[in-house]
Amino acid sequence: MIDTDGYRPNVGIIICNNNAQVLWAKRFGQHSWQFPQGGIKEGETPEQAMYRELYEEVGLKPEHVKLLATSRHWLRYKLPKRLVRWDSPDPVCIGQKQRWFLLQLISDEQQIEFEACGNPEFDAWRWVTYWYPVRQVVSFKCEVYRCALKEFSAVAFSLMKKSSDKKRNKRPRRASFYKKR
C-alpha cells in the first residue's frame, strides 16, 4: 500500500524502560541497528499495525507493554535512490511515512523474543541511552528519529523521574550492622 506521493505507510516503535533507555535492535545478519518498524496493511489502523509488528519483530504482546504516546503527525523519510525499486510492477515507493509509538516495557525483558514468528528481523538487542539512536541510525532515517524522540522526550524522561521517586520514597532501612553494646 503506497500513497499517491510514493510513501509507504509504516509504524515506528520506541520501547523504553524505567531509566529512559530505549531498545536498540540489530538487523538480522547485518551491522545496522534500528528501532522496530513495519508496514501498515490494508484495512489496519496504525495502532493495530504497531501491535502486530511489535509481536512479529520483538515477540512482545500488548500485555507486555504500556502505550505512552503516539506521534501527532506522520514523519517521512526518503529512501536513497540506490534503494528505490524502479523496475517493480507495483507503484514506486520512494520512502516511508511513519506514525511513531512510545511504549514502556512493563514485563520482564525475558519476554523479548526475535523468533516469535519464525522469520526474525533482528538478531541482537540492547538498552541504549535515549538520544543514542539519532547518532547511530542510517543517515536517511536520522531526522525522523530525532523528531520522534524529541516529541516523546518529556514522557520518556518522566518515567525515569517516577522510577527514582519510588526508590527515594521507600521506607528507610535500618542499618543491620548497628548493635547496642
From Swiss-Prot:
The record places the motif (Nudix box) at 38-59
Gene3D superfamilies named in the record: Nucleoside Triphosphate Pyrophosphohydrolase (3.90.79.10)
Keywords for the protein's UniProt record, in alphabetical order: Hydrolase
Residue ranges constituting the Nudix hydrolase domain according to the UniProt record: 6-150
The reply on keyword Glycoprotein is: no
Taxonomically, which superkingdom? Answer: Bacteria
**Quick one: a GO cellular component term?**
cytoplasm
GO MF, one term, reads:
mRNA 5'-diphosphatase activity
Q: What class of enzyme is it?
A: hydrolase
Q: Which Pfam families match?
A: NUDIX
State its role.
Accelerates the degradation of transcripts by removing pyrophosphate from the 5'-end of triphosphorylated RNA, leading to a more labile monophosphorylated state that can stimulate subsequent ribonuclease cleavage.
Which HAMAP family does the record cross-reference, listed alphabetically?
Answer: Nudix_RppH
Family, per entry: Belongs to the Nudix hydrolase family. RppH subfamily.
Q: Would you tell me the protein name for this molecule?
A: RNA pyrophosphohydrolase
Give the source species. Answer: Psychromonas ingrahamii (strain DSM 17664 / CCUG 51855 / 37)
Gene responsible for this protein? rppH
